[in-house]
Amino acid sequence: RTLAAGDPVRLYLLSLAAVIIQQRTAVNLAAQQNLLSYAQDGYLDALGTLLSVTRLAESRAVTTIKFTLSQALATVYTIPAGTEVTNGVVTFATDHELNIEKGKLEGSVTASCTVAGTIGNDYLAGQVNTIVKPMTFVSKAENTTITTGGSEAESDESLAERIRLAPNGFSVAGPEKAYVYHAKSVSSSVLDVSVTSPTPGEVDVYVLLAGGELPSKETLEQIDAYLSD
């Protein structure tokens, strides 16, 4: 029997075909979520738990803040951890206590942005220079390095790559990909890692951040501490 374009039977069969196609598409998509190359969002997170890999949260931009005293003192001057310095847009808080030795006029300490994400990146040296709560004897505070290292939550692409690399991290013999995996596990801002060994017992790790940026001294120190732990 030939069905005309408007035949009710033909229209009914077409409606059934649409439902069947959608169901099979949904089944195929659900099956793909079990595969690392296709998994997304929560499904990818679930695959990561099989290898104890979790999605990296947002990271905070870091910098170094230099505090300058109005005069040299006869005693040690302490600047508490959490002291905030701002540029009117973002605020950085010192990571730990800073003790300026007696007779000295200045001291430096690392500081992290109070808001996670890329919002704290790319402020040049000297741009973060206003103390939120003025302190006795402190005449000036400013960042001495460009603010870098802030990133958003880890993307599916980055997480999938770390899951692929995770088995290399089980080794304690220091294979190349183990260094890559651990370096990328420090922060979601780490885009790429290159590892070389110029001489036996010596390993050089080169890091590139998201957006093609070079890591700051503070970020490199974080990675070095993580790899040395």
Task: Report the location of each language-model feature.
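N-terminal polar alpha-helical/low-complexity "assembly arms" that mediate subunit docking
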Residues: 1-178, 182-185
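Carbohydrate-recognition loop of C-type lectin domains
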Residues: 93-95, 171-229
